[in-house]
Every structure is written in C-alpha cells, then in structure tokens.
C-alpha cells in the first residue's frame, strides 16, 4: 500500500469533533494548536496505531533515524488541516512530508549511561569493547568534555551534579536525540547479553548491568503460626565486580574478540547475524531464573544457527539434523561424535517435554550441559578455519556434509 493511502486511512480513522464532556471516549490526545483527536470505538484505536506503524515502517531511512512517537507527532502537525477538515491528503502533501523529514540532517550522538558491577584495572584509559567505550567517570570526565568542547563554544552542564562511577558510551546515528537514546539502549541491552555469554556461567557472583541491573539486595520473610513467630533474611545479587579489562573477555582463541568485533559492523552477512542472535539468546538464557525457560532459550540459540527457516517447526528430522551437525562440529573422533549426538538428542527430548507438556523438572546438570554445548558450537564456528568464513546456513551444511562423507570407503572383501 502506498504511503498516500495509509495517510488517508489515518486521517479517516481520527475523530476530531469536540469531545469535552463526553463519557464514551476511549482515548484522546491533542495535536497542533490544542486540536483534539479522540476515539469512541476501541477497535479504531488499534487500527489507527497499526496504520501509524505501517506508515512509519514504509521508509527504512526514516525508520532508522526517527522514533515512532516523533514520526507520529510530525505527521499530525504536517497534516493538521486534513485532520481538522476531514479532507484527503494529496500526493504532493505526502511528498513534502517525506522531504521535510529527510531534510533534517543525520547527526552522530554520543549516548552515555551508567554501567554497574564492573571495575577497571587501568581506569585512566578508556576501555574499548567492540563498538562500546567504558570510562571511569572521575578519571575521564575532563577527557569526555574536551571532545565536545572542541566542537562547541561551551560544554553544557549535562552531568547535573551526578557522579557515576563508570559510564558506557555508544555512538548512534539519528536525526534527533530521542532516537539516539532508543538506538543506544538497544545496543546496551545487547552489551549485557554478550557479556553474559562471554562470562559463560549462570552465576549470581557477578552482575553487570546498564539497563537491567538489580544489584545486591535482601529478601525478607515474616512467618507466623499459632505456635511460633519467626523471620528470615537472605542476601541476593553480585558478590564482586567484574574486571572488565581482563584479556580473557576479548580472547581470540575463544572467539570472544570476534563477537565484540561484530558490534562495530553494519554489514554482517546472514550467518554472522545468526551467530550474534544466538549469542543474545544465550545471554537471555543465563539471565533467566526459570530453569525450563532458560533451557528453552539455550535450545533456541542452537536452532537459530542450524535451522534453514525462522518459521521451521522442530520436527524429529530437524532435531536429528541439529544433533548430527553439533556432533560433527564438536566431536574429534567417531566415538566422540556418536556420544555427542546421543547427548543432544536426549536434551532435545527434554525440550519437547517442556514445550508440549509443560514439564518443569529440568536439572541444573542438563541445563548447564545444553548451555555449554551452545557456547562451544559458537566458539568452534568462530575459531575454526573451515567454518569462520561461512556466510549462510546453506554454506554451513555444505561443509558439514563434506565432513560427514569424508570417512574411509567401505571396501569389498577379498575374493568376492
């Protein structure tokens, strides 16, 4: 559908008469100079929001550089007369709207947020992890301000007398600062997930957070019965900070350096995107307190790597293919591959029980085994000369098929 048609659908759905004093209004808001848009029919609210989203998603450049809210506000302002008079927009109206949006220059924003649960061995030097930069605030405040002082007449007092211990920075390309925050926050979420994957252990000894930090806390309970009164207090949360500039976290032999490097690239191939998505699902798995849910997320990480289609249902044949592929990648001998294949099939039978019958009886041992298999597959793919240049799942299966059939041929017995 053309943008013109969507805009006129939006105008038609919006009700703009005077709604003051009415009791049947489900939603109302103002646009332009205090002009109201309201909805009586709740279904029209859903249709209106859907139309706004379709309009916003119709141009990828605009979608990448504006927030949905900003786009909505600008659309209402541009077509204010059409809203108030209930008249259809014309092609030239829509063209000028898009041109005005694209006339706004794309700028580079440095977005900083507090990062918790870390410490730096060398705090006087900014730490680079892929596309992220981490600063100890006390040591680096003047350095950060000097970068922007050189580009502006004076540096505004943006810190508002705050005194964070550490800051993490992401540079975002956007047309307004709200979009820069939205983009940066997506990457800060990814940072947390990547770091969990790299740490590799679902433990509460460490917790690094930008947007989702809970920290050290107490859980108290007060217990009463007819015969006694009692209370309980337990501590939860990280016991010590992570030393974020340890070489282990960027080790090339484990592929961690490559994973961080992927965060700086905008042109990842299809398979590299799968790897990064699998890393994020492993990070989600490690943060999930529910054993069945954490188990499923670890399985999803493997399925992202090995399934041809995102819509594929995990049938027995696909499960066999995944198990065999994992065995070929991780095993170094026939016996080891047979053992791994059997192990993965057993773990996938547990996945099936969770999904189809709601089974909650997942042992820590089974979960940790699946988690380590998922992490090991990614490590092997990123560090193996045969696999680190794979650019699609089809390419991966071509290589694995050659490995599978590279064994000795079955020879004919003598005398036959």
What are these regions (language model features)?
Residues 281-282, 320-331, 349, 353-357:
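Surface-exposed loop-to-helix/strand elements on domain peripheries
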Residues 29-34, 38-42, 295, 337-391:
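Charge-enriched, short contiguous segments at helix-coil
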Residues 269-278, 325, 345-351:
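Active-site-adjacent bridging/hinge elements
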Residues 48, 58, 300-338:
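Flexible secondary-structure boundary motifs
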Residues 4-8, 12, 21, 37, ...:
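Charged, non-catalytic interaction/linker regions at domain boundaries
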Residues 18-31:
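N-terminal ordered "arm"
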Residues 277, 294-298, 318, 322, ...:
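Residue-level detector of well-ordered alpha-helical segments, enriched
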């Amino acid at each position: 559908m053309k943008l013109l048609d969507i805009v006129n659908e939006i105008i038609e759905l919006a009700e703009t008469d005077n709604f003051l004093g009415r009791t049947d209004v489900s939603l109302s808001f103002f646009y332009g100079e205090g002009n109201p848009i309201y909805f009586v029919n709740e279904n029209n609210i859903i249709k209106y929001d859907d139309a706004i989203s379709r309009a916003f998603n119709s141009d990828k450049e605009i979608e990448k550089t504006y927030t949905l809210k900003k786009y909505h506000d600008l659309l209402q302002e541009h077509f204010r007369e059409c809203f108030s008079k209930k008249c259809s927009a014309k092609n030239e109206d829509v063209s000028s709207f898009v041109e005005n949006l694209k006339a706004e220059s794309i700028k580079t924003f440095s977005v900083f947020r507090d990062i918790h649960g870390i410490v730096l061995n060398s705090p006087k030097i900014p730490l680079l992890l892929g596309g992220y930069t981490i600063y100890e605030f006390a040591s680096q405040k003047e350095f950060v301000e000097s970068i922007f002082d050189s580009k502006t007449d004076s540096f505004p007092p943006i810190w508002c007398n705050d005194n964070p211990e550490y800051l993490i920075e992401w540079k975002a390309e956007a047309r307004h600062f709200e979009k820069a925050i939205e983009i940066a926050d997506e990457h800060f979420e990814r940072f947390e997930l990547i770091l969990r994957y790299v740490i590799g252990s679902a433990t509460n000894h460490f917790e690094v957070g930008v947007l989702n930090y809970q920290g050290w806390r107490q859980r108290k309970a007060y217990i009463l019965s007819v015969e006694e009164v009692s209370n309980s207090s337990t501590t939860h949360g990280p016991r010590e900070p992570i030393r974020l500039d340890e070489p282990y976290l960027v080790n090339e032999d484990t592929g961690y350096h490559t994973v961080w490097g992927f965060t700086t690239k905008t042109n990842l191939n299809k398979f590299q995107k799968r790897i990064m998505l699998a890393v994020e699902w492993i990070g989600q798995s490690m943060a999930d307190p529910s054993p069945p849910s954490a188990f499923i997320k670890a399985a999803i990480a493997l399925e992202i790597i090995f399934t041809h289609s995102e819509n594929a249902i995990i049938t027995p044949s696909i499960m066999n293919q995944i198990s065999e592929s994992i065995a070929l990648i991780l095993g170094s001998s026939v016996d080891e591959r047979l053992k791994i294949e059997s192990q993965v099939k057993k773990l996938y039978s547990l996945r099936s029980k969770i999904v189809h019958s709601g089974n909650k009886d997942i042992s820590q041992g089974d979960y940790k085994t699946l988690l380590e298999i998922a992490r090991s597959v990614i490590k092997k793919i990123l560090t193996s000369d045969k696999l680190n240049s794979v650019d699609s799942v089809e390419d991966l299966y071509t290589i694995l098929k050659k490995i599978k059939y590279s064994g000795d041929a079955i020879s004919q017995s003598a005398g036959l």
